[in-house]
C-alpha cells in the first residue's frame, strides 16, 4: 500500500490562490467519507502521479492528513489537457471491510487467431463494474483473446474470475468480437478503375457561353 502526504489548506482560497498553488506543483484536494469530516488539503502533483502508477486507479492509499493517516481511494480528479496539469482531486476515506462498486479496465491479452487471418478485433466494452472490498479490487481484468476465430466473441459470462470480487455487468454483454475482414477491391480492380478515370474526357466549356453567363450576372 502506497503512502502520500498532504497539507491541510486553511481558510477560504480565491481563484488566484488556487492558480498560484497549482503553478507551484501542488494540487488542491478534498478528503471526505468514512470516519472523517470534509477537509481541504493539497498534495504534490508529482508524488500523486507516482502513487497512482504504483497502486492503480482503484488502489488504496495511506493519506497523511495532519497527525492522522487515513485510508483513501481516489473518488474523482480533474485534469487540464491544455496545461497538462491535474487541477483537483477528491479523496474518499474508506472502510476496508465494506464492499464498493467501481469501474475496472478490461485488458485484452494475446493476438486473436482470426486477426491473423485478416479479421478485425472490436471491443465494445472497455470497463466492467466490479464489487469487492477495497483490498480485493483488481487493477485490471485480463481477457485472453488468443483462441478467437473470425465471428467468435466473448461475453462477460466467459470471464474466468481469479479473485474475490463480483462482476455486476449483464452476463450477456459482449466484451470483444472478431469480425470478418471488409471486402476491399483487388489490385486489378483498382487499376481498372484508375484507367477508366484517366480515359474520361473532360467537359469542354464554351468560352462564349461562359462569357455570356458572366455578363448576365453583372447585369
Curated annotation (Swiss-Prot):
Which SUPFAM superfamilies does this chain map to? Answer: Ribosomal protein L25-like (SSF50715)
A biological-process GO annotation:
translation
Q: State the NCBIfam families in the record.
A: bL25_bact_ctc (TIGR00731), PRK05618.2-4 (NF004133), PRK05618.2-5 (NF004134)
Q: Which family does it belong to?
A: Belongs to the bacterial ribosomal protein bL25 family. CTC subfamily.
What the entry lists under HAMAP family is as follows: Ribosomal_bL25_CTC
The job of this chain, per UniProt, is described as: This is one of the proteins that binds to the 5S RNA in the ribosome where it forms part of the central protuberance.
Task: Name the chain's protein.
Answer: Large ribosomal subunit protein bL25
Amino acid at each position: 500500500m502506497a503512502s502520500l502526504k498532504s497539507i491541510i489548506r486553511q481558510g477560504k482560497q480565491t481563484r488566484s490562490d488556487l492558480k498560484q498553488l497549482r503553478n507551484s506543483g501542488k494540487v488542491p484536494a478534498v478528503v471526505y467519507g468514512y470516519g472523517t469530516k470534509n477537509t481541504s488539503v493539497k498534495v504534490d502533483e508529482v508524488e500523486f502521479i507516482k502513487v497512482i502508477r504504483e497502486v492503480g486507479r482503484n488502489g488504496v492509499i495511506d493519506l497523511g492528513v495532519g497527525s492522522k493517516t487515513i485510508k483513501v481511494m481516489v473518488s474523482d480528479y480533474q485534469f487540464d489537457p491544455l496545461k497538462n496539469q491535474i487541477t483537483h482531486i477528491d479523496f474518499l476515506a474508506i472502510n476496508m471491510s465494506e464492499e464498493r462498486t467501481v469501474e475496472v479496465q478490461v485488458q485484452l491479452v494475446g493476438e486473436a487467431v482470426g486477426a491473423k487471418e485478416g479479421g478485425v478485433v472490436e471491443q465494445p466494452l472497455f470497463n466492467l463494474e466490479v464489487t469487492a472490498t477495497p483490498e480485493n479490487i483488481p487493477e485490471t481484468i485480463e481477457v485472453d483473446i488468443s483462441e478467437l476465430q473470425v465471428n467468435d466473441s466473448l461475453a462477460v459470462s466467459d470471464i474466468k474470475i481469479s479473485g474475490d470480487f463480483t462482476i455486476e455487468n449483464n452476463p450477456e454483454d459482449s466484451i470483444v468480437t472478431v469480425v470478418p475482414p471488409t471486402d476491399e477491391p483487388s489490385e486489378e480492380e483498382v487499376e481498372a478503375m484508375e484507367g477508366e478515370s484517366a480515359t474520361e474526357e473532360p467537359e469542354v466549356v464554351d468560352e462564349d457561353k461562359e462569357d455570356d453567363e458572366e455578363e448576365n450576372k453583372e447585369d
